[in-house]
């Protein structure tokens, strides 16, 4: 008997969450609505980062999504490590063609999934990133975020415009899963390991959380910056040394005799 699913591409959407079950269930329902016309088999894997809130008993009436599974972390490890665990698990255990990573709070808008899907069909061997062209936070946080991007660019030489919202072909998902730096920063590892020629992008608008205010604080943003920089630690050391040498040369070359006295 002919099985059309056998010919379809297999997409797995990887979502990491912590104490945000209400949001992730709403996200799954919205994903199901957005992908209804996809010519693909779609399933979801949730990595639960040792949530302390009980998972509600929710009946999901899904028309397109084939399955929803959950991996439970024994200890809270943070978003980056949950993504790393999910990538490693899927690369070693599952049959798929693409993995799409998403945040579980609604800030990665499911309305943009079809943009990623269509772009991956046009470029089947390339990683597709959702590059932010607009953010939803207030002006102060936007200023801090732009400062973070500039700092990361100065120290790493990489202008990273994307976060976790990325579509990975299987070959690159498996490659990333083997990198030690994936445990520090997903976006930093993508920028380091996957060359510009192997990446393409779609324009993305950061959405608003489904429930409650944004959980990213100034401290979280600092950790995020340092995590990306840590991925490029050798480059950072070299660039920092060169900047220091240039600065000292500039300072000493402009010292006057009066200053020396």
Question: What annotation goes with each model-predicted range?
Answer:
Residues 40-51, 71-72:
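Short beta-strand/loop segment that forms part of the nucleotide-sugar
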Residues 48-57, 106-107:
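A conserved acidic beta->alpha catalytic loop
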Residues 20-35, 54:
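Short, well-formed alpha-helical segments that are part of the catalytic scaffolds
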Residues 237-261:
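Membrane-embedded multi-pass helical conduit in multi-pass membrane proteins
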Residues 10-12, 43:
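Cell-envelope/extracellular polymer assembly enzymes that use nucleotide-activated donors
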Residues 73-75, 79-89, 98-101, 107-184, ...:
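Acceptor/aglycone-binding surface of glycosyltransferases and processive sugar-polymer synthases
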Residues 174-236:
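Catalytic donor/gating beta->alpha subdomain of glycosyltransferases that bind UDP-sugars
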Residues 1-7:
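Short, Lys/Arg-enriched N-terminal segments with co-localized hydrophobic residues
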């Amino acid at each position: 008997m002919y099985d059309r699913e056998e010919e379809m591409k297999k997409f797995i959407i990887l979502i990491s969450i912590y104490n945000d079950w209400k949001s992730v269930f709403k996200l799954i329902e919205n994903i199901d609505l957005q992908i209804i016309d996809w010519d693909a088999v779609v399933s979801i894997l949730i990595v639960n980062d040792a949530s302390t809130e009980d998972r509600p008993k929710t009946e999901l009436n899904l028309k397109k999504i084939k399955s929803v599974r959950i991996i439970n972390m024994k200890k809270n490890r943070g978003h980056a490590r949950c993504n790393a665990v999910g990538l490693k698990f899927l690369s070693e255990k599952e049959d798929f063609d693409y993995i799409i990573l998403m945040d579980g709070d609604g800030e990665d808008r499911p309305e943009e999934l079809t943009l990623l899907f269509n772009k991956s069909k046009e470029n089947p061997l390339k990683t597709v990133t959702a590059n932010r062209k607009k953010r939803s936070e207030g002006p102060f946080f936007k200023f801090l975020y732009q400062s973070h991007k500039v700092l990361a660019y100065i120290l790493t030489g990489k202008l990273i415009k994307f976060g976790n919202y990325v579509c990975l072909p299987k070959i690159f998902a498996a490659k990333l899963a083997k990198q030690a730096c994936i445990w520090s920063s997903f976006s930093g590892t993508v920028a380091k390991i996957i060359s510009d020629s192997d990446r393409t992008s779609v324009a993305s608008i950061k959405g608003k959380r489904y429930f409650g205010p944004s959980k990213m604080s100034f401290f979280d943003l600092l950790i995020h910056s340092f995590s990306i920089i840590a991925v490029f630690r050798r480059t950072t050391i070299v660039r920092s040394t060169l900047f220091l040498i240039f600065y000292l040369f500039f300072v000493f070359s402009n010292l006057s005799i009066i200053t020396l006295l």
